[in-house]
Amino acid sequence: MDLALFFRNEVKPALGCTEPGAVAYAASIAARHCPGEPLSVALSLSLSMFKNGRDVGIPGTGGLRGNRLAAVLGVLAGDADKGLMALEHIDMAVVERAQTLLDAGMVTEEVVDGVPGVYAAVTLRCAGHEVTVTVAGRHDRVASIVVDGEVVGGEGMERAPEADGTLHGGASCEPSASFTEPPLPAYLEELRECDFAQLWDMAAGIDATLEQELLRGAAMNMAVARMGLESGWGLGVGHTLAAHAEAADLHARIRFMAGAAADVRMAGAPQPVMSSAGSGNHGITATVPVAVAAEGLGVSPRVQAEALALSHLVTGYLKAHTGRLTPICGCSVAAGAGAAAGIVKVLGGNAVQAERAVASLMASLMGMLCDGAKGSCGLKVATAAGEAYAAALLGMDDRGVQRPEGVVNPDIATTARALARLSREGFAAADAVMVELLGGGKH
């Protein structure tokens, strides 16, 4: 597998929550194709995009929240060239104008069925023109750009089969058209076929350039964690836990540092984090526990980098099975599993111990629901970080899950398949109910 390609696409900086970031990105592209004053913006979102963007803070807005705000900010001042960081340079004057347009009812939002988990169609109307930009499959993947009914760009979508079983590809200007998940990139297909020993060996084989990039990403996320400790952003999970912890307690430090970083991100601080598998909170969970353990135990930068690589690879492996956005909390289950494996590497363990740690983590947290991105994600991230360390200790002592326990198996491939089926089939109804509880009708 091309490791450089994996890390370039799966581990990269993101500003704010990636769901409203994707909405803002699509809106900023739409604005390029729609001259004049905006008249209306309509959002058509998947269940997951709706719930993950509903209550999360938007960076640079003073704590304002939501996909609708992200969309109108993207239209007014988004920089499409910056992708998921399209709102990096907005100011309060733009925010005030955006709020005025929101209050006037300019933006509508609806949840649509039959689309991939990552799906947002932004339809912008201005004088004499209508533009629909759709992102799908990945947060920064532009599937289609449709201007006045004509497809002018985008990578295309995979249509769901017709009644006769035929498939039709290509872009559509219908936001509610039925589509399937786009195929995985080749590098993720390769990753899905790996066993754990191969993941372990790949992490050990990173080159000097990847080593430096991984350490840079960890430093970025640790800086965000320290912000959370100093000022108590959001729910103040990390700040509060730190105030009641012994400084020498590594387990507690792993928990409060990870929680603090998520506090900052969910509150909408204008500070980028290094993401993993398309999610900033996944990136925090995959990196901060490993970095804190490495710092506390005084291991070499090389060991830390290999541990970070393993964490991202395990996270990516599990997400390649489940999909980008799921009813199960991927920060806890996928990135938490990655962190457990990475911490075993920091502790000097081997591949067998790391795979057992992954199984133990998943046995603990597999049922944790994702009810959207919001301040309380800090609680889940802190829990996942703490459980990752506990699972790593069990692995190092050759304890934990060593035979099938419920739906969890010591073999990562078997458990990944079970997780994927539970997420896609078992928890699908739960996702729909959660969105109803969150008010996911058109408004």
UniProtKB/Swiss-Prot annotation:
GO terms for biological process: L-cysteine catabolic process to pyruvate. One of its GO terms (molecular function) is L-cysteine desulfhydrase activity. It comes from the Bacteria. Residues 156-178 are annotated as: Disordered. Belongs to the UPF0597 family. PANTHER family: UPF0597 PROTEIN YHAM. This is UPF0597 protein Dvul_2496.
